[in-house]
């Protein structure tokens, strides 16, 4: 039986050799494609040079029950209490590979069945995924569109890809191996061009009835949730048990020309990796299925990476959190003995991976002021459990003029080696419930020639904190130029480190905002806090009709601020 199965798998791909690379041609099987695709990857691992795996047009079904199960702790995902295991159910596992391209030529679809991780790139070099569509047969963000609303009821049509069951008057959303009720909700309004968080129409209902198959009536003891006919409720649970893709401890990875129709149960996460290129990506709802939601949370999370992280020519719409979030991680020093310290992951959703290696440069920072008190080089590092890392310090150097405490216990540490240079260009952000971009890295950041439409929070947020999300760190060189901000909430750009203000110094430095256009029906606000060196010049503020709009600035605890000629 095994021999017959192997023969059947081999029949679905062929191998040819070109001048530049070996080519493995793969055809979509009738059933699950997991074995076929991973057999091609095993073939690629034996090649002596570059390999291109070409996927023939069609749908490649990836089912959770046939998936490869591997243990991965991933930044900003489910905690130990939210989800007991870190097992990921993986469709394609790229492990210890070099110089491999997977090319769908724009006509191959990876279709997941069940909550799972479509692909993982782990400990690889020079990997390229291109020309693919990624979707789910059972999206874990069910949807229903409002037909009618009365004072105390809603009549809604369930999307064709959303399955449900009513038990004892309660609605349960269902998929392959998953179900939930109540949950978190957003409301997509095609008339307003918004996709905003709201109260769950399921959680508030006292009764749910099936009027006809796929048509539900929700009854409420008080007022029905605000909505209008034609608007769509998007609902989800909050457990980030899987991701839409993982780049782990890899170098030179490119995602190009990929259409994400659904990303669950979190976005694509890159962690402890270098040189990441994300280009020509489309995260946009599939009109063919009348769906309106693409993301379960963030689209792209970049955590503790290095080298150049580049986003270019992407289109982002219908997320359930930030499209792009780039940050490091602060760990808290809980024990110190001589030159050995224990650093602990503090946020419940980020832990379980070793974030330090020999030779890395680490900053020691006061969590209240977010100002560094010193630096050291890692002599050795090992995890004693999934929360705690034992680090040997070499050559601690105090920051000149800093108040170094008698004990470093209670301070926070950031790995300065694993902080990327960032470029985000020529991209479009719309139908977002939160921010467009959140970025914190000390290396240069360029955000240029993008368009942000109706972000209900800051279109661009530069934060840094050591007591809530523990997402680091301070920026030192940021350029925001040539962008268009259309009807975004205030402050449109927010520099907002979560520090206790101190006369000791400023958290962020050298932020330049030039040649941008702000379009708004109300005065435009820019928020600046704890920055040394902020320049805002050559920008334009307009009303929707094109007349001049007022520019307002909320500036506190900052120095060397230049507000040049803006119009």
For every predicted segment, state its role.
Residues 7-16:
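Bacterial N-terminal signal peptides
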Residues 25-54:
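Acidic Gly/Asp/Thr-rich repetitive segments characteristic of extracellular carbohydrate-active
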Residues 42-43, 61-101, 111-130, 138-155, ...:
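Extracellular beta-strand-rich solenoid/capping regions of secreted or surface-exposed proteins
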Residues 51-53, 60, 92, 100, ...:
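Solenoid scaffold repeats with emphasis on beta-solenoid/beta-helix
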Residues 64, 112-118, 138-142, 242-244, ...:
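Short glycine/acidic-rich loop motifs that flank beta-strands on beta-rich extracellular proteins
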Residues 136-138, 159-211, 351-386:
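Ser/Thr/Gly-rich low-complexity blocks that favor extended beta-strand/coil architectures
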Residues 195-241, 375, 382-422, 430:
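Small/polar beta-strand repeat architecture
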């Amino acid at each position: 039986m095994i021999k017959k199965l192997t023969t059947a798998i081999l029949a679905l791909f062929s191998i040819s050799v070109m001048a530049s690379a070996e080519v493995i041609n793969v055809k979509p099987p009738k059933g699950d494609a997991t074995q076929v695709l991973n057999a091609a990857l095993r073939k690629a691992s034996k090649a002596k040079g570059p390999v291109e795996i070409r996927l023939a047009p069609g749908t490649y079904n990836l089912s959770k029950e046939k998936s490869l199960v591997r243990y991965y702790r991933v930044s900003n995902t489910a905690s130990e209490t939210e989800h007991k295991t870190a097992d990921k159910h993986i469709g394609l596992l790229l492990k210890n590979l070099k110089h491999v391209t997977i090319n769908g030529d724009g006509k191959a679809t990876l279709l997941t069945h069940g909550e799972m991780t479509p692909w993982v790139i782990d400990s690889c070099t020079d990997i390229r995924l291109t020309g693919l569509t990624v979707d789910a047969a059972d999206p874990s963000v069910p949807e229903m569109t409002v037909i009618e609303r009365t004072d105390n009821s809603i009549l809604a049509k369930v999307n064709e890809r959303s399955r449900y069951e009513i038990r004892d008057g309660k609605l349960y959303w269902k998929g392959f191996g998953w179900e939930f009720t109540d949950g978190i909700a957003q409301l997509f309004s095609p008339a307003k061009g918004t996709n905003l968080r709201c109260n769950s129409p399921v959680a508030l209902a006292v009764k749910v009835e099936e009027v006809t198959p796929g048509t539900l009536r929700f009854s409420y003891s008080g007022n029905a949730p605000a909505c209008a006919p034609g608007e769509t409720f998007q609902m989800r649970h909050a457990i980030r048990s899987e991701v839409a893709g993982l780049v782990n401890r890899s170098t030179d990875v490119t995602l190009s020309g990929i259409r994400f129709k659904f990303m669950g149960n979190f976005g694509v996460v890159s962690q402890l990796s270098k040189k990441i290129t994300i280009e020509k990506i489309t995260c946009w709802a599939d009109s063919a299925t009348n769906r309106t939601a693409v993301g379960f949370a963030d689209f792209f999370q970049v955590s503790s990476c290095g080298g150049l992280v580049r986003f270019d020519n992407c289109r982002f719409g219908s997320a359930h959190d930030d499209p792009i979030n780039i940050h490091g991680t602060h760990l808290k020093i809980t024990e110190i003995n001589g030159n050995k310290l224990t650093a602990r992951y503090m946020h419940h959703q980020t832990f379980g991976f070793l974030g330090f290696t020999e030779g890395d440069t680490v900053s020691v920072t006061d969590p209240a002021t977010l100002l560094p008190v010193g630096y050291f080089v890692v002599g050795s590092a090992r995890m004693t459990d999934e929360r705690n890392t034992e680090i040997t310090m070499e050559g601690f150097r105090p920051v000149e003029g800093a108040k170094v405490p008698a004990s470093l216990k209670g301070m926070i540490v950031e790995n300065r080696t694993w902080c990327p240079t960032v470029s985000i260009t020529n991209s479009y952000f719309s139908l977002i419930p939160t921010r467009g971009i959140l970025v914190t890295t000390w290396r240069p950041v360029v955000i240029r020639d993008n368009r942000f439409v109706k972000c209900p929070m800051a279109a661009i947020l530069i934060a840094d904190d050591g007591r809530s999300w523990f997402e680091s760190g301070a920026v030192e060189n940021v350029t925001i130029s040539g962008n268009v901000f259309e009807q975004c909430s205030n402050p449109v750009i927010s520099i907002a480190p979560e520090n206790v203000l101190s006369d000791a110094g400023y958290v962020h430095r050298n932020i330049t905002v030039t040649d941008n256009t702000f379009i708004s029906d109300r005065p435009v606000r820019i928020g600046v806090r704890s920055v040394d060196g902020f320049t805002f010049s050559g920008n334009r503020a307009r009303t929707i009709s094109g007349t001049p709009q007022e520019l307002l600035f909320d500036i506190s605890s900052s120095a060397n601020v230049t507000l040049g000629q803006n119009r």
